[in-house]
Protein backbone atom coordinates (compact mmCIF):
# COMPACT_ATOMS: atom_id res chain seq x y z
CA UNK A 1 0.00 0.00 0.00
CA UNK A 2 2.86 2.39 0.73
CA UNK A 3 4.24 2.00 -2.80
CA UNK A 4 0.83 2.88 -4.23
CA UNK A 5 0.82 6.04 -2.13
CA UNK A 6 4.27 7.03 -3.37
CA UNK A 7 3.27 6.63 -7.01
CA UNK A 8 -0.23 8.06 -6.74
CA UNK A 9 -0.48 10.98 -4.29
CA UNK A 10 -4.13 11.50 -5.26
CA UNK A 11 -4.96 8.08 -3.81
CA UNK A 12 -3.05 9.04 -0.68
CA UNK A 13 -5.32 12.03 -0.26
CA UNK A 14 -8.52 10.08 -0.94
CA UNK A 15 -7.56 7.32 1.54
CA UNK A 16 -6.30 9.58 4.32
CA UNK A 17 -8.03 9.60 7.75
CA UNK A 18 -11.45 11.21 7.48
CA UNK A 19 -11.40 11.17 3.66
CA UNK A 20 -14.19 9.47 1.66
CA UNK A 21 -12.09 6.35 1.03
CA UNK A 22 -10.28 6.06 4.34
CA UNK A 23 -8.93 2.54 4.81
CA UNK A 24 -8.89 0.85 8.23
CA UNK A 25 -8.06 -2.58 9.65
CA UNK A 26 -11.04 -4.62 10.86
CA UNK A 27 -11.66 -8.20 11.93
CA UNK A 28 -14.17 -9.80 9.59
CA UNK A 29 -15.28 -13.43 9.96
CA UNK A 30 -12.18 -14.08 12.04
CA UNK A 31 -9.81 -12.50 9.51
CA UNK A 32 -8.02 -9.17 9.78
CA UNK A 33 -8.82 -7.20 6.63
CA UNK A 34 -8.34 -3.71 5.29
CA UNK A 35 -11.72 -2.20 4.52
CA UNK A 36 -13.10 1.21 3.69
CA UNK A 37 -14.16 2.83 6.95
CA UNK A 38 -17.32 4.10 5.27
CA UNK A 39 -18.34 0.68 3.92
CA UNK A 40 -22.10 0.25 4.45
CA UNK A 41 -23.48 -2.75 6.30
CA UNK A 42 -24.96 -4.36 3.17
CA UNK A 43 -25.39 -3.83 -0.55
CA UNK A 44 -28.94 -2.73 0.24
CA UNK A 45 -27.49 0.45 1.75
CA UNK A 46 -26.11 1.25 -1.72
CA UNK A 47 -29.61 0.78 -3.11
CA UNK A 48 -31.15 3.01 -0.44
CA UNK A 49 -28.64 5.80 -0.99
CA UNK A 50 -29.34 5.68 -4.73
CA UNK A 51 -33.04 6.37 -4.15
CA UNK A 52 -32.14 10.00 -3.49
CA UNK A 53 -31.35 10.41 -7.20
CA UNK A 54 -35.11 10.46 -7.74
CA UNK A 55 -36.21 11.40 -11.25
CA UNK A 56 -32.72 11.37 -12.75
CA UNK A 57 -32.42 8.96 -15.64
CA UNK A 58 -30.79 5.70 -14.62
CA UNK A 59 -31.10 3.18 -17.47
CA UNK A 60 -31.37 3.83 -21.20
CA UNK A 61 -32.29 0.81 -23.32
CA UNK A 62 -33.53 1.33 -26.88
CA UNK A 63 -36.54 3.64 -26.49
CA UNK A 64 -36.95 3.00 -22.76
CA UNK A 65 -35.63 5.61 -20.32
CA UNK A 66 -36.00 4.47 -16.70
CA UNK A 67 -35.55 6.90 -13.80
CA UNK A 68 -34.17 5.97 -10.39
CA UNK A 69 -37.62 6.41 -8.86
CA UNK A 70 -39.27 4.08 -11.36
CA UNK A 71 -36.45 1.55 -11.12
CA UNK A 72 -36.74 1.19 -7.36
CA UNK A 73 -40.54 1.12 -7.49
CA UNK A 74 -40.29 -1.98 -9.67
CA UNK A 75 -37.45 -3.55 -7.67
CA UNK A 76 -39.30 -3.02 -4.38
CA UNK A 77 -42.42 -4.66 -5.81
CA UNK A 78 -40.39 -7.66 -6.95
CA UNK A 79 -38.71 -8.03 -3.54
CA UNK A 80 -42.06 -8.01 -1.77
CA UNK A 81 -43.55 -10.51 -4.23
CA UNK A 82 -40.66 -12.93 -3.78
CA UNK A 83 -40.99 -12.81 0.01
CA UNK A 84 -44.77 -12.78 0.39
CA UNK A 85 -45.98 -14.75 -2.62
CA UNK A 86 -43.06 -17.12 -3.20
CA UNK A 87 -41.99 -17.30 0.45
CA UNK A 88 -38.34 -16.79 -0.43
CA UNK A 89 -36.13 -17.37 2.59
CA UNK A 90 -32.96 -15.47 3.43
CA UNK A 91 -29.96 -17.09 1.77
CA UNK A 92 -31.89 -19.02 -0.88
CA UNK A 93 -30.63 -18.91 -4.47
CA UNK A 94 -32.55 -17.12 -7.21
CA UNK A 95 -31.11 -17.27 -10.72
CA UNK A 96 -31.09 -14.50 -13.33
CA UNK A 97 -30.86 -15.76 -16.90
CA UNK A 98 -31.35 -12.86 -19.30
CA UNK A 99 -29.44 -10.75 -21.77
CA UNK A 100 -28.50 -7.24 -20.60
CA UNK A 101 -31.68 -5.22 -20.06
CA UNK A 102 -33.38 -3.09 -17.36
CA UNK A 103 -35.27 -6.17 -16.12
CA UNK A 104 -31.96 -7.90 -15.36
CA UNK A 105 -30.92 -5.04 -13.08
CA UNK A 106 -34.37 -4.84 -11.46
CA UNK A 107 -34.16 -8.58 -10.81
CA UNK A 108 -30.76 -8.28 -9.13
CA UNK A 109 -31.87 -5.55 -6.74
CA UNK A 110 -35.17 -7.31 -6.10
CA UNK A 111 -33.47 -10.58 -5.18
CA UNK A 112 -30.80 -9.07 -2.93
CA UNK A 113 -33.28 -6.82 -1.09
CA UNK A 114 -35.44 -9.89 -0.45
CA UNK A 115 -32.48 -11.59 1.24
CA UNK A 116 -31.85 -13.96 -1.64
CA UNK A 117 -28.54 -14.80 -3.28
CA UNK A 118 -28.54 -13.65 -6.90
CA UNK A 119 -27.16 -16.45 -9.09
CA UNK A 120 -25.89 -14.91 -12.32
CA UNK A 121 -26.24 -17.36 -15.20
CA UNK A 122 -24.21 -16.95 -18.37
CA UNK A 123 -27.06 -16.22 -20.78
CA UNK A 124 -24.81 -17.00 -23.76
CA UNK A 125 -24.15 -20.53 -22.59
CA UNK A 126 -25.51 -23.73 -24.06
CA UNK A 127 -28.59 -25.15 -22.36
CA UNK A 128 -26.69 -28.00 -20.71
CA UNK A 129 -24.37 -25.51 -18.99
CA UNK A 130 -27.33 -23.39 -17.88
CA UNK A 131 -29.04 -26.43 -16.36
CA UNK A 132 -25.82 -27.42 -14.60
CA UNK A 133 -25.50 -23.93 -13.13
CA UNK A 134 -29.04 -24.08 -11.72
CA UNK A 135 -28.36 -27.46 -10.14
CA UNK A 136 -24.92 -26.58 -8.77
CA UNK A 137 -26.22 -23.40 -7.10
CA UNK A 138 -29.31 -25.02 -5.51
CA UNK A 139 -31.49 -22.47 -7.29
CA UNK A 140 -35.11 -22.42 -6.09
CA UNK A 141 -36.49 -19.83 -8.52
CA UNK A 142 -35.56 -18.48 -11.96
CA UNK A 143 -36.00 -15.04 -13.49
CA UNK A 144 -35.44 -15.32 -17.23
CA UNK A 145 -36.33 -13.86 -20.58
CA UNK A 146 -38.53 -15.86 -22.92
CA UNK A 147 -35.70 -17.23 -25.06
CA UNK A 148 -33.74 -18.66 -22.11
CA UNK A 149 -36.78 -19.96 -20.25
CA UNK A 150 -37.90 -21.78 -23.39
CA UNK A 151 -34.52 -23.52 -23.54
CA UNK A 152 -34.70 -24.43 -19.86
CA UNK A 153 -38.26 -25.76 -20.04
CA UNK A 154 -37.43 -27.79 -23.17
CA UNK A 155 -34.57 -29.36 -21.20
CA UNK A 156 -36.79 -30.38 -18.30
CA UNK A 157 -36.36 -27.46 -15.90
CA UNK A 158 -39.49 -27.34 -13.73
CA UNK A 159 -38.40 -24.60 -11.32
CA UNK A 160 -40.93 -21.82 -10.74
CA UNK A 161 -40.04 -18.89 -12.95
CA UNK A 162 -40.67 -15.23 -13.61
CA UNK A 163 -40.49 -14.55 -17.34
CA UNK A 164 -39.64 -11.16 -18.78
CA UNK A 165 -41.75 -10.96 -21.94
CA UNK A 166 -45.07 -9.27 -22.71
CA UNK A 167 -47.83 -11.57 -24.02
CA UNK A 168 -45.53 -14.52 -23.46
CA UNK A 169 -46.29 -18.11 -24.40
CA UNK A 170 -45.76 -18.79 -20.70
CA UNK A 171 -48.81 -16.73 -19.68
CA UNK A 172 -50.81 -19.94 -19.35
CA UNK A 173 -47.99 -21.88 -17.68
CA UNK A 174 -48.98 -22.47 -14.05
CA UNK A 175 -45.32 -22.65 -13.02
CA UNK A 176 -44.43 -19.31 -14.62
CA UNK A 177 -45.41 -15.71 -13.91
CA UNK A 178 -45.09 -12.71 -16.21
CA UNK A 179 -42.55 -10.17 -14.97
CA UNK A 180 -44.78 -7.13 -15.47
CA UNK A 181 -47.62 -8.68 -13.48
CA UNK A 182 -45.72 -8.53 -10.18
CA UNK A 183 -44.56 -4.92 -10.48
CA UNK A 184 -47.72 -3.52 -8.88
CA UNK A 185 -47.16 -5.46 -5.66
CA UNK A 186 -47.02 -3.33 -2.51
CA UNK A 187 -43.47 -2.97 -1.12
CA UNK A 188 -42.36 -4.70 2.08
CA UNK A 189 -42.97 -2.79 5.29
CA UNK A 190 -40.01 -4.38 7.09
CA UNK A 191 -36.70 -4.83 5.26
CA UNK A 192 -34.77 -8.10 5.51
CA UNK A 193 -31.91 -7.81 8.00
CA UNK A 194 -28.65 -8.25 6.09
CA UNK A 195 -25.01 -7.80 7.08
CA UNK A 196 -21.63 -7.73 5.37
CA UNK A 197 -21.10 -11.43 6.14
CA UNK A 198 -24.26 -12.54 4.30
CA UNK A 199 -23.91 -13.86 0.76
CA UNK A 200 -25.11 -11.55 -2.01
CA UNK A 201 -24.28 -13.24 -5.31
CA UNK A 202 -22.90 -16.26 -7.07
CA UNK A 203 -20.93 -15.75 -10.27
CA UNK A 204 -19.57 -18.58 -12.36
CA UNK A 205 -15.96 -19.01 -13.34
CA UNK A 206 -15.30 -19.24 -17.06
CA UNK A 207 -15.12 -23.02 -17.00
CA UNK A 208 -12.53 -23.20 -19.78
CA UNK A 209 -11.22 -26.38 -18.17
CA UNK A 210 -14.12 -28.47 -16.91
CA UNK A 211 -17.44 -27.48 -15.37
CA UNK A 212 -17.81 -23.88 -14.25
CA UNK A 213 -17.79 -23.30 -10.49
CA UNK A 214 -20.00 -20.85 -8.58
CA UNK A 215 -17.92 -18.29 -6.68
CA UNK A 216 -19.76 -17.02 -3.59
CA UNK A 217 -19.53 -13.27 -3.09
CA UNK A 218 -20.57 -11.72 0.23
CA UNK A 219 -22.08 -8.28 0.72
CA UNK A 220 -18.65 -7.07 1.86
CA UNK A 221 -17.04 -8.46 -1.31
CA UNK A 222 -19.48 -6.58 -3.54
CA UNK A 223 -19.35 -3.36 -1.49
CA UNK A 224 -15.54 -3.32 -1.52
CA UNK A 225 -15.41 -3.86 -5.28
CA UNK A 226 -17.90 -1.05 -5.94
CA UNK A 227 -16.04 1.36 -3.68
CA UNK A 228 -12.75 0.48 -5.40
CA UNK A 229 -14.24 1.45 -8.76
CA UNK A 230 -15.85 4.56 -7.33
CA UNK A 231 -12.46 5.59 -5.91
CA UNK A 232 -10.86 5.10 -9.33
CA UNK A 233 -13.50 7.39 -10.85
CA UNK A 234 -12.78 9.99 -8.20
CA UNK A 235 -9.07 9.94 -9.01
CA UNK A 236 -9.91 10.84 -12.62
CA UNK A 237 -11.70 13.99 -11.47
CA UNK A 238 -8.82 14.94 -9.18
CA UNK A 239 -6.32 14.44 -12.01
CA UNK A 240 -8.34 16.75 -14.24
CA UNK A 241 -8.37 19.33 -11.45
CA UNK A 242 -4.57 19.12 -11.26
CA UNK A 243 -4.27 19.29 -15.04
CA UNK A 244 -6.33 22.49 -15.26
CA UNK A 245 -5.05 23.88 -11.95
CA UNK A 246 -8.51 24.33 -10.50
CA UNK A 247 -10.71 22.97 -7.72
CA UNK A 248 -12.32 19.53 -7.89
CA UNK A 249 -15.74 21.15 -7.43
CA UNK A 250 -15.17 23.30 -10.52
CA UNK A 251 -14.33 20.22 -12.59
CA UNK A 252 -17.48 18.46 -11.38
CA UNK A 253 -19.60 21.47 -12.30
CA UNK A 254 -18.29 21.54 -15.86
CA UNK A 255 -18.10 17.80 -16.53
CA UNK A 256 -21.01 16.07 -18.24
CA UNK A 257 -23.02 13.90 -15.80
CA UNK A 258 -21.50 10.43 -15.31
CA UNK A 259 -22.70 7.99 -17.93
CA UNK A 260 -21.40 4.51 -18.68
CA UNK A 261 -21.86 2.33 -21.76
CA UNK A 262 -22.61 -1.24 -20.69
CA UNK A 263 -20.51 -3.46 -22.94
CA UNK A 264 -19.74 -6.26 -20.49
CA UNK A 265 -22.45 -8.83 -19.78
CA UNK A 266 -24.09 -8.25 -16.41
CA UNK A 267 -23.37 -11.84 -15.37
CA UNK A 268 -19.69 -10.87 -15.47
CA UNK A 269 -18.23 -9.13 -12.42
CA UNK A 270 -17.11 -6.13 -14.50
CA UNK A 271 -20.65 -5.57 -15.75
CA UNK A 272 -22.16 -6.10 -12.30
CA UNK A 273 -19.91 -4.01 -10.07
CA UNK A 274 -17.84 -1.72 -12.29
CA UNK A 275 -20.70 -0.49 -14.48
CA UNK A 276 -24.10 -1.28 -12.92
CA UNK A 277 -23.60 -0.86 -9.18
CA UNK A 278 -20.87 1.79 -9.35
CA UNK A 279 -22.96 4.04 -11.58
CA UNK A 280 -25.83 3.56 -9.15
CA UNK A 281 -23.70 4.86 -6.26
CA UNK A 282 -22.77 8.08 -8.11
CA UNK A 283 -26.17 8.78 -9.64
CA UNK A 284 -24.86 7.90 -13.08
CA UNK A 285 -26.70 6.84 -16.20
CA UNK A 286 -26.22 3.44 -17.84
CA UNK A 287 -26.73 2.94 -21.56
CA UNK A 288 -27.54 -0.67 -22.46
CA UNK A 289 -26.96 -2.20 -25.89
CA UNK A 290 -28.92 -5.22 -27.14
CA UNK A 291 -25.90 -6.60 -28.96
CA UNK A 292 -22.41 -5.42 -29.74
CA UNK A 293 -22.23 -3.00 -32.66
CA UNK A 294 -19.26 -0.63 -32.81
CA UNK A 295 -21.02 1.96 -34.95
CA UNK A 296 -24.02 2.04 -32.62
CA UNK A 297 -21.68 2.30 -29.62
CA UNK A 298 -20.06 5.41 -31.12
CA UNK A 299 -23.46 6.90 -31.92
CA UNK A 300 -24.51 6.33 -28.30
CA UNK A 301 -21.33 7.96 -26.98
CA UNK A 302 -22.18 11.05 -29.02
CA UNK A 303 -25.94 11.07 -28.34
CA UNK A 304 -25.94 10.20 -24.62
CA UNK A 305 -22.67 12.02 -23.78
CA UNK A 306 -21.09 8.87 -22.36
CA UNK A 307 -18.19 9.66 -20.04
CA UNK A 308 -16.77 6.22 -19.23
CA UNK A 309 -15.99 3.45 -21.67
CA UNK A 310 -14.65 0.11 -20.51
CA UNK A 311 -14.15 -2.84 -22.80
CA UNK A 312 -11.90 -5.62 -24.01
CA UNK A 313 -9.32 -5.25 -26.81
CA UNK A 314 -11.73 -6.58 -29.44
CA UNK A 315 -14.41 -3.96 -28.70
CA UNK A 316 -11.85 -1.16 -28.61
CA UNK A 317 -10.47 -2.19 -32.01
CA UNK A 318 -13.98 -2.42 -33.44
CA UNK A 319 -14.70 1.15 -32.38
CA UNK A 320 -11.35 2.47 -33.59
CA UNK A 321 -11.97 0.95 -37.02
CA UNK A 322 -15.55 2.29 -37.18
CA UNK A 323 -14.34 5.80 -36.35
CA UNK A 324 -12.36 5.81 -39.59
CA UNK A 325 -15.62 5.67 -41.56
CA UNK A 326 -17.57 8.48 -39.82
CA UNK A 327 -16.81 11.47 -37.62
CA UNK A 328 -18.28 11.39 -34.11
CA UNK A 329 -18.21 13.84 -31.23
CA UNK A 330 -16.49 11.81 -28.53
CA UNK A 331 -15.42 14.74 -26.39
CA UNK A 332 -17.58 13.63 -23.44
CA UNK A 333 -15.34 10.60 -22.79
CA UNK A 334 -13.06 11.22 -19.83
CA UNK A 335 -12.20 7.59 -19.05
CA UNK A 336 -11.32 4.69 -21.35
CA UNK A 337 -10.18 1.46 -19.75
CA UNK A 338 -9.23 -1.98 -20.95
CA UNK A 339 -9.86 -5.36 -19.35
CA UNK A 340 -10.25 -9.04 -20.13
CA UNK A 341 -6.74 -9.39 -21.51
CA UNK A 342 -3.74 -7.14 -21.96
CA UNK A 343 -3.79 -4.39 -24.58
CA UNK A 344 -0.99 -4.24 -27.10
CA UNK A 345 1.16 -1.13 -27.30
CA UNK A 346 -0.38 -0.43 -30.70
CA UNK A 347 -3.90 -0.48 -29.22
CA UNK A 348 -2.98 1.89 -26.39
CA UNK A 349 -1.40 4.29 -28.88
CA UNK A 350 -4.53 4.31 -31.04
CA UNK A 351 -6.85 4.79 -28.05
CA UNK A 352 -4.76 7.68 -26.75
CA UNK A 353 -4.78 9.43 -30.13
CA UNK A 354 -8.50 8.86 -30.75
CA UNK A 355 -9.85 9.92 -27.35
CA UNK A 356 -7.61 12.88 -26.39
CA UNK A 357 -9.87 13.99 -23.50
CA UNK A 358 -9.90 10.57 -21.87
CA UNK A 359 -7.59 9.13 -19.26
CA UNK A 360 -6.46 5.61 -20.07
CA UNK A 361 -6.61 2.85 -17.51
CA UNK A 362 -6.34 -0.88 -16.97
CA UNK A 363 -6.58 -3.39 -14.18
CA UNK A 364 -6.35 -7.02 -13.21
CA UNK A 365 -8.85 -9.16 -11.38
CA UNK A 366 -11.03 -12.22 -11.62
CA UNK A 367 -14.45 -13.50 -10.63
CA UNK A 368 -13.03 -14.93 -7.40
CA UNK A 369 -11.74 -11.50 -6.35
CA UNK A 370 -14.96 -9.62 -7.19
CA UNK A 371 -13.13 -7.79 -9.94
CA UNK A 372 -10.01 -5.69 -9.84
CA UNK A 373 -7.21 -6.18 -7.33
CA UNK A 374 -4.87 -3.84 -9.19
CA UNK A 375 -5.62 -0.86 -11.39
CA UNK A 376 -4.25 2.45 -12.53
CA UNK A 377 -5.44 5.31 -14.70
CA UNK A 378 -4.14 8.55 -16.09
CA UNK A 379 -0.55 9.44 -15.26
CA UNK A 380 -0.16 6.48 -12.90
CA UNK A 381 -1.09 4.09 -15.71
CA UNK A 382 1.08 5.78 -18.35
CA UNK A 383 4.13 5.31 -16.10
CA UNK A 384 3.80 1.57 -16.71
CA UNK A 385 1.32 0.98 -19.57
CA UNK A 386 2.27 -2.69 -19.97
CA UNK A 387 1.43 -3.36 -16.32
CA UNK A 388 -1.89 -4.37 -14.79
CA UNK A 389 -1.79 -1.32 -12.55
CA UNK A 390 -0.95 -0.70 -8.91
CA UNK A 391 -2.04 -3.08 -6.18
CA UNK A 392 -5.22 -1.71 -4.62
CA UNK A 393 -5.21 -0.72 -0.94
CA UNK A 394 -7.87 -3.32 -0.11
CA UNK A 395 -5.72 -6.31 -0.94
CA UNK A 396 -2.37 -7.92 -0.26
CA UNK A 397 -0.53 -9.61 -3.10
CA UNK A 398 2.44 -11.94 -2.85
CA UNK A 399 4.29 -13.78 -5.59
CA UNK A 400 5.37 -17.34 -4.76
CA UNK A 401 7.64 -19.85 -6.48
CA UNK A 402 7.01 -23.55 -7.05
CA UNK A 403 8.42 -24.24 -3.58
CA UNK A 404 5.83 -21.95 -1.98
CA UNK A 405 8.37 -19.34 -0.94
CA UNK A 406 7.85 -15.66 -1.73
CA UNK A 407 9.75 -14.42 -4.78
CA UNK A 408 11.92 -11.27 -4.83
CA UNK A 409 10.67 -8.17 -6.64
CA UNK A 410 10.94 -8.50 -10.40
CA UNK A 411 10.86 -12.31 -10.40
CA UNK A 412 7.81 -14.16 -11.68
CA UNK A 413 5.75 -16.65 -9.74
CA UNK A 414 2.14 -17.45 -8.91
CA UNK A 415 0.03 -14.46 -7.87
CA UNK A 416 -1.64 -14.96 -4.47
CA UNK A 417 -4.23 -12.55 -3.09
CA UNK A 418 -5.98 -11.91 0.20
CA UNK A 419 -8.33 -9.14 1.18
CA UNK A 420 -11.87 -7.85 1.42
CA UNK A 421 -12.74 -8.63 -2.19
CA UNK A 422 -11.69 -12.31 -2.16
CA UNK A 423 -14.63 -14.72 -2.50
CA UNK A 424 -16.00 -16.86 0.31
CA UNK A 425 -15.32 -20.03 -1.67
CA UNK A 426 -16.87 -22.16 -4.41
CA UNK A 427 -20.44 -23.14 -3.59
CA UNK A 428 -20.68 -26.79 -2.50
CA UNK A 429 -17.13 -27.38 -3.75
CA UNK A 430 -15.01 -27.70 -0.57
CA UNK A 431 -12.23 -29.61 -2.35
CA UNK A 432 -11.99 -27.06 -5.16
CA UNK A 433 -12.06 -24.25 -2.61
CA UNK A 434 -9.25 -25.87 -0.62
CA UNK A 435 -7.11 -26.07 -3.77
CA UNK A 436 -7.13 -22.30 -4.24
CA UNK A 437 -7.67 -20.95 -0.70
CA UNK A 438 -4.66 -21.68 1.52
CA UNK A 439 -4.04 -19.94 4.84
CA UNK A 440 -6.29 -17.07 3.81
CA UNK A 441 -4.56 -16.57 0.44
CA UNK A 442 -6.30 -17.04 -2.90
CA UNK A 443 -3.93 -18.85 -5.29
CA UNK A 444 -4.94 -17.46 -8.66
CA UNK A 445 -3.12 -19.76 -11.06
CA UNK A 446 -1.83 -16.63 -12.78
CA UNK A 447 1.88 -15.96 -13.13
CA UNK A 448 3.19 -12.44 -12.60
CA UNK A 449 5.61 -10.24 -10.74
CA UNK A 450 5.74 -6.98 -8.78
CA UNK A 451 8.21 -4.22 -9.55
CA UNK A 452 9.85 -1.87 -7.06
CA UNK A 453 7.15 0.77 -7.53
CA UNK A 454 4.28 -1.59 -6.72
CA UNK A 455 3.06 -2.26 -10.25
CA UNK A 456 1.77 -5.74 -10.98
CA UNK A 457 2.71 -7.42 -14.26
CA UNK A 458 0.86 -10.46 -15.59
CA UNK A 459 3.13 -12.98 -17.28
CA UNK A 460 0.66 -15.77 -17.98
CA UNK A 461 -1.70 -18.40 -16.68
CA UNK A 462 0.17 -21.32 -15.12
CA UNK A 463 -2.00 -23.49 -17.36
CA UNK A 464 -1.14 -21.35 -20.42
CA UNK A 465 2.55 -22.12 -20.30
CA UNK A 466 4.24 -24.11 -23.06
CA UNK A 467 7.18 -26.42 -22.38
CA UNK A 468 9.15 -26.67 -25.60
CA UNK A 469 12.42 -28.57 -25.66
CA UNK A 470 12.55 -28.34 -21.86
CA UNK A 471 12.16 -24.55 -21.84
CA UNK A 472 9.19 -22.73 -20.33
CA UNK A 473 7.45 -20.30 -22.70
CA UNK A 474 4.74 -18.01 -21.32
CA UNK A 475 2.14 -17.18 -23.96
CA UNK A 476 1.43 -13.75 -22.45
CA UNK A 477 5.08 -12.75 -22.87
CA UNK A 478 4.98 -13.71 -26.55
CA UNK A 479 1.71 -11.82 -27.04
CA UNK A 480 3.00 -8.74 -25.27
CA UNK A 481 6.30 -8.67 -27.15
CA UNK A 482 5.01 -9.36 -30.65
CA UNK A 483 1.93 -7.21 -29.98
CA UNK A 484 4.19 -4.16 -30.08
CA UNK A 485 4.65 -4.60 -33.85
CA UNK A 486 2.74 -1.82 -35.57
CA UNK A 487 0.98 -4.19 -37.96
CA UNK A 488 -0.48 -6.46 -35.28
CA UNK A 489 -4.02 -5.72 -34.16
CA UNK A 490 -4.70 -8.76 -31.93
CA UNK A 491 -2.60 -11.79 -31.13
CA UNK A 492 -3.00 -15.15 -29.41
CA UNK A 493 -0.17 -17.58 -28.67
CA UNK A 494 -0.78 -21.25 -27.96
CA UNK A 495 1.00 -24.58 -27.98
CA UNK A 496 0.41 -27.80 -29.89
CA UNK A 497 1.96 -31.24 -29.43
CA UNK A 498 5.29 -31.90 -31.11
CA UNK A 499 7.00 -35.30 -31.08
CA UNK A 500 10.49 -33.86 -30.78
CA UNK A 501 10.00 -30.76 -28.62
CA UNK A 502 7.02 -31.86 -26.57
CA UNK A 503 5.16 -28.71 -27.60
CA UNK A 504 5.71 -26.06 -30.25
CA UNK A 505 4.60 -22.44 -30.21
CA UNK A 506 2.02 -21.15 -32.68
CA UNK A 507 0.68 -17.59 -32.90
CA UNK A 508 -2.58 -16.47 -34.50
CA UNK A 509 -2.97 -12.79 -35.28
CA UNK A 510 -5.11 -10.23 -37.01
CA UNK A 511 -3.52 -7.30 -38.82
CA UNK A 512 -4.33 -3.64 -39.29
CA UNK A 513 -2.07 -3.32 -42.34
CA UNK A 514 -0.80 -5.75 -44.99
CA UNK A 515 2.26 -7.60 -43.66
CA UNK A 516 4.01 -10.80 -44.69
CA UNK A 517 4.62 -13.48 -42.07
CA UNK A 518 8.31 -13.38 -43.02
CA UNK A 519 8.48 -9.81 -41.74
CA UNK A 520 6.83 -10.86 -38.48
CA UNK A 521 9.29 -13.71 -38.10
CA UNK A 522 12.24 -11.34 -38.56
CA UNK A 523 10.74 -9.10 -35.86
CA UNK A 524 10.24 -12.08 -33.53
CA UNK A 525 13.86 -13.17 -33.94
CA UNK A 526 15.02 -9.65 -33.09
CA UNK A 527 12.91 -9.46 -29.94
CA UNK A 528 12.77 -13.01 -28.58
CA UNK A 529 15.14 -15.77 -27.54
CA UNK A 530 15.54 -18.44 -30.21
CA UNK A 531 13.42 -21.01 -28.38
CA UNK A 532 10.58 -18.48 -28.03
CA UNK A 533 10.28 -17.75 -31.76
CA UNK A 534 6.95 -19.13 -33.09
CA UNK A 535 7.01 -22.18 -35.34
CA UNK A 536 4.05 -20.91 -37.36
CA UNK A 537 2.02 -17.75 -37.88
CA UNK A 538 -1.69 -17.87 -38.65
CA UNK A 539 -3.28 -14.76 -40.14
CA UNK A 540 -7.00 -14.45 -39.39
CA UNK A 541 -9.64 -11.79 -39.98
CA UNK A 542 -11.36 -12.36 -36.65
CA UNK A 543 -11.23 -14.36 -33.44
CA UNK A 544 -13.85 -16.13 -31.35
CA UNK A 545 -14.19 -14.77 -27.82
CA UNK A 546 -15.47 -15.98 -24.48
CA UNK A 547 -18.23 -14.02 -22.73
CA UNK A 548 -15.55 -12.13 -20.81
CA UNK A 549 -13.72 -11.06 -23.96
CA UNK A 550 -10.86 -13.55 -23.94
CA UNK A 551 -9.77 -15.18 -27.20
CA UNK A 552 -10.85 -18.83 -27.33
CA UNK A 553 -7.48 -20.48 -27.83
CA UNK A 554 -8.85 -24.02 -27.80
CA UNK A 555 -10.69 -23.26 -31.05
CA UNK A 556 -7.51 -21.87 -32.60
CA UNK A 557 -5.62 -24.97 -31.52
CA UNK A 558 -8.27 -27.28 -32.99
CA UNK A 559 -8.35 -25.35 -36.28
CA UNK A 560 -4.56 -25.53 -36.55
CA UNK A 561 -4.46 -29.27 -35.86
CA UNK A 562 -7.31 -29.92 -38.31
CA UNK A 563 -5.45 -27.95 -40.98
CA UNK A 564 -2.26 -29.94 -40.31
CA UNK A 565 -4.13 -33.22 -40.79
CA UNK A 566 -5.44 -32.06 -44.13
Task: Report residues per predicted region.
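Conserved AMP-binding/adenylate-forming core of the ANL superfamily
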Residues: 37-38, 55-89, 95-101, 105-109, ...
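AMP-binding/adenylate-forming catalytic core of the ANL superfamily
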Residues: 128, 132, 142, 309, ...
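Conserved AMP-binding/adenylation subdomain of ANL enzymes
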Residues: 223-263, 267-307, 322
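Gly/Ser/Thr-rich phosphate-binding loop
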Residues: 281, 306-311, 322-383, 396
Amino acid sequence: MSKTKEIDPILTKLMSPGAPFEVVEKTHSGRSLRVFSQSPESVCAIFNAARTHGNKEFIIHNDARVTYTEFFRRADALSAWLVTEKELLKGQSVAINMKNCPEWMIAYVGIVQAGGVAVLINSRNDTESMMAALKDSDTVFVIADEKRLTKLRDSGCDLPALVSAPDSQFASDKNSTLFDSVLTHAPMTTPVNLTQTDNASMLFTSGTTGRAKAAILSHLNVISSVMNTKMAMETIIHRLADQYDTAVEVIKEHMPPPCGLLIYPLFHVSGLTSVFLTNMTIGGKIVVMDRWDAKQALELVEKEKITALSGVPATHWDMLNAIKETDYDLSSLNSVSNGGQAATQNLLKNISETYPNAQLGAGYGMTETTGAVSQANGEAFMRAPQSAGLVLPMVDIKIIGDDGNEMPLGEAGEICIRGATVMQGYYNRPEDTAKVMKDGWMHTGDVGYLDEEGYLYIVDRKTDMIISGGENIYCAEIEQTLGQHEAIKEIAAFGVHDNRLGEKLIVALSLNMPTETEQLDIYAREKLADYKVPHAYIITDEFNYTATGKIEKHKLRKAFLDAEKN
